Amino acid sequence: MESTFVPDMETKIETTNTGGKVLAYDGDELVGRLDFSFKENVLSIDHTYAYKEGIGVGSLLVSAINDYAVSKGLRVMPVCSYASVWYERHPQFKDLLVTND
């Protein structure tokens, strides 16, 4: 099966005092969502949902929240299995990670 990458997808980050979500859009269509929570200086990636598969939605969502964490000086705890795999594939960000031990 051939996958199609859509490079012009956009993300929007919405935050509250306890966490928030990253929404991914392909034009006006919502194609993915990532839920996260805050615990002190740690951002926990709790769930990643891709409503369209094979176009890079999950990677876009985790990349966006990773950039947000870096910009805010936060550490990251990838609770979501997709986010854990993303960080394994992007070892340049290993210093951001905290474990759930």
Where are these regions (language model features)?
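Active-site rim helix/loop that mediates acceptor-substrate recognition in acyltransferases
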Residues: 2-19
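A generic local structural motif
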Residues: 9-10, 31, 61-64
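A conserved beta-strand-loop-helix scaffold within acyl/acetyltransferase catalytic domains
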Residues: 16-20, 26-42
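Short, conserved beta-strand segments within well-ordered enzyme catalytic domains
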Residues: 23, 44, 75-78
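A short, internal acetyl-CoA/4′-phosphopantetheine-binding micro-motif in the GNAT/acyltransferase core
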Residues: 47-54
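Conserved acetyl-CoA-binding loop-helix of GNAT-fold acetyltransferases
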Residues: 55-67
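C-terminal structural segments of small proteins and small subunits
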Residues: 68-101
